[in-house]
Amino acid sequence: RNELMPFIDEIKEGDSVCLSIRMGDYIKNPIHGVCSQKYYQAAIDKMYELHPNAKIFVFSDDVEAVKKTYSFKNNVFYEPDGCNELEKITYMSMCKHFILSNSSFSWWTQYLCSYKKKTVIAPEKWYAVDIPCDIYEDNWILLSV
């Protein structure tokens, strides 16, 4: 889709950060739960601390709620309207750095990223219940949910 080339170009230039905020079906799920607003804001602030010129690319099933809830210092972009799942995971994995939600979709985006010096911020607890989880890499930054 040619109309998305400017969005793709923005991702490819500079310190692009994929911010994945999952709402929807996770809100009422007793196993997964949802990362708190405090987690996401702390992750955003930490990413700006590590990458002062970060460009935040927001991917969410409720972009309007994200716009009303979170504060960004500069350079924020929202996923294009009408993206299918394949397009979305492609754009997300093009980013250099990642703020993950506790979802496998979010996890795969950072895994598919080819940038070797990526910064990954993830919730320290992946599930709302005590289930063993070994998806974390040693170099990730874990924040409380």
Predicted regions: what is each one?
Residues 79-82, 124, 144:
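Residues at the C-termini of beta-strands that transition into short coil/loop
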Residues 1-85:
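Core catalytic architecture of nucleotide-activated donor-dependent transferases building glycoconjugates
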Residues 25, 71, 85-88, 104, ...:
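Residue-level preference for alpha-helix termini and adjacent loops
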Residues 85-132:
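A donor-sugar binding/catalytic signature common to diverse glycosyltransferases
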Residues 15-17, 54-56, 75-76, 95-98, ...:
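Hydrophobic beta-strand segments of well-ordered beta-sheets in folded domains
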Residues 39, 64-70, 107-111, 126, ...:
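Tryptophan-centered motif/residue detector
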Residues 33-34, 71-73, 113-115, 134-137:
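Short, glycine/charged-enriched secondary-structure capping and boundary segments
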Residues 128-145:
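Leloir-type glycosyltransferase catalytic cores
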